[in-house]
């Protein structure tokens, strides 16, 4: 469950290491984001010479959350960290690699490029 001011790890090689959620997109008063949701975030930690610089405002999609996700079959899925992937204007990932597992709910949100780059889909 991601809300404003939540800090997330970045699960790609775009150059950012940590971001902070500014706004959850999708509706006028949407408070929480889950896996597959698009958020607006600010880059709080970045590596030098990366594609994404410190302080840049970016759109990201959440790929892992500590809060469990209930599937239709009754099973629960949760991860060890909150993580997101940075998107460009065409909703494709900025980075060329994805690190760590990605939840299957990202596929249902139609981010197929992220699913194809991910090493593991849970």
From Swiss-Prot:
One GO CC annotation: cytosolic large ribosomal subunit
BP terms from Gene Ontology: translation
Highest taxon in the source lineage: Bacteria
Gene3D superfamilies: Ribosomal protein L14
Keywords associated with the record: Ribonucleoprotein, Ribosomal protein, RNA-binding, rRNA-binding
GO molecular function, a single term: large ribosomal subunit rRNA binding
Keyword RNA-binding: yes
SMART domains, alphabetized: Ribosomal_L14
CDD domains xrefs: Ribosomal_uL14
Function description: Binds to 23S rRNA. Forms part of two intersubunit bridges in the 70S ribosome.
HAMAP family: Ribosomal_uL14
Subunit structure comment from the entry: Part of the 50S ribosomal subunit. Forms a cluster with proteins L3 and L19. In the 70S ribosome, L14 and L19 interact and together make contacts with the 16S rRNA in bridges B5 and B8.
Similarity-based family: Belongs to the universal ribosomal protein uL14 family.
The protein, known as: Large ribosomal subunit protein uL14
Species name: Helicobacter pylori (strain J99 / ATCC 700824)
Gene this protein is translated from: rplN
